[in-house]
Amino acid sequence: MTHCENCCKSLPLAIFLIIVLGFAVYSNCLDGKFIWDDFGLVKDNAYIKSWLNFPEIMTKGMGAGSGSSSNFYRPLQMVTHMVDYSLWKLNVVGYHLTNTLLHISAALAVYWLINIIFCSQPLAFLTASLFVAHPVHTEAVSYISGRSDSLSAIFILLSLIFYIKSLSSVRNKTYILALLSCVFALLSKENSVVIPLLILLYHYAFKSKFKAKEFLFISLIVLGYVALRLTVLKSSIPVSPVLFQRIPGFFVALAEYARLLLFPFDLHLEYGNRLFSIFDPKAILGLAIAVSLITIAVRQREKNKLVFFSISWFLLALLPVANIYAINYSFMMEHWLYLPSIGFFLILAKGLCLLYDSRRFRYAAAALTISILSFYACLTIKQNNYWRDPVSLYKRALQFSPDSWRFLNELGLEYADRKLNKEAIAAYQKALEINPGLAGVYYNLGTLYSSAGDDRQAIISLEKAVELAPGYVDAYIVLGRVYCRANKKEEALSLYKKLMEIKPGLAAARLDSPCLYFK
């Protein structure tokens, strides 16, 4: 199977059905709430609320607008949040609508790419439909802050599409579009560095004419981006085990990814920063899967180029998230499958097409296709229900990670926001049992006690917070207010004097100084 120079035009009905399917499976997440990182990246992010902050967006990490540090430089994602805020302010429906539209756009780009390469609208349609409906993508779609995956996928696919088109074009227009798409992809997410490898895969798989100059320019753009990320735009890298300790984790992840694609059950938020032995059964299984996939790809290179291309796509697209260069605490994430999964769906779609092409099994193939899509759609709709409600999401995550203090803290915050103080206190206390050194959790617990009028417990928790984090300004201020309310004048004055030594220019401390109340 080779690249078709004059591929037939996209079928309007196929495009329409992909769009309808996308909205059908994600319509129930449109009224979901802000959750997890959405507060830092959207709700509490001052930068997205004015276009005057555009230079800040383009030069700083993702969390800078809310005062937090981040290892990620994804300005295009932040620009989409700026557009959303301009249109909807903080109406969460608009943000979820944008995520859904981005996912559908990525599916249409999948359809376009497969149609160009393999000249088969049924194959392209099935691949895109499986992609848009599979529940493993809910984290990238139902989660507002997860849109970097769909955004980068759109431009990675467009970069490949325009590059392939430029090979048979005498005009530079399509090649310029390929370069621009590459730039936009890199500004969306770090995994876009894989673009040159995917281009080489295309040339190697289909033996198309290689134009060194065109490939060089795209490669230089990617190398320039990598150089900037390692120097000028460098962020702090989380403390992480050395490479040989992380490798078993990749094979465990590979085994899990295979399970999630084939049997997409037990989907949940985060899988943790765990270390594995190379003798772990899942690591051995993952290694066996990797060896098997590579062996099949090599053997099928000449016999079945689609199989070779699909497997190679899957493995190459996983490379940026294989923790070879650690930029994240987790050994795996469900949304990391967003781009690699295209290879899996392409093989599955081809199998369904072959079954349909045999007259004997045509009706069985149609029934099987509808069943698979319906199965995916039902699981996606079910998974969206967890993402709609933060309490449901965190409680589900705790089923798989019961010792996660992060989930317990977030659960406590949600309970507190709903005035469920008893449940919030229980969540905070359990988080502190797991990790007693969490100043932020003590602060959350203290503010909850304070709002409930329990000054004694509030003081105990807030004093522990400032003990663990001597520079915790908010904890000082709230503790000072509780001291004032509890008529502990000397403690309040001493606390604020200490804060003034730590942060002498802090206006909030001066305004809230108990001296104003006790003069």
Regions found by a protein language model. Give the residues of each.
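Register position in tetratricopeptide repeats
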Residues: 417, 451, 485-486, 519
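Polytopic membrane enzymes that build or remodel cell-surface glycoconjugates and lipids
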Residues: 2-447, 451, 467, 472-474, ...
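Terminal, low-structured helical/coil segments at or just beyond the last alpha-helical repeat
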Residues: 493, 501-519
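Low-complexity, intrinsically disordered tandem-repeat tracts enriched in small residues
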Residues: 439-441, 461, 486, 494-495, ...
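Residue-level detector of bioactive/disordered segments in secreted/extracellular proteins
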Residues: 6-10, 485-486, 517
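Ankyrin-repeat and related helical/solenoid repeat scaffolds used for protein-protein interactions
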Residues: 463, 467-477, 481-486, 490-494
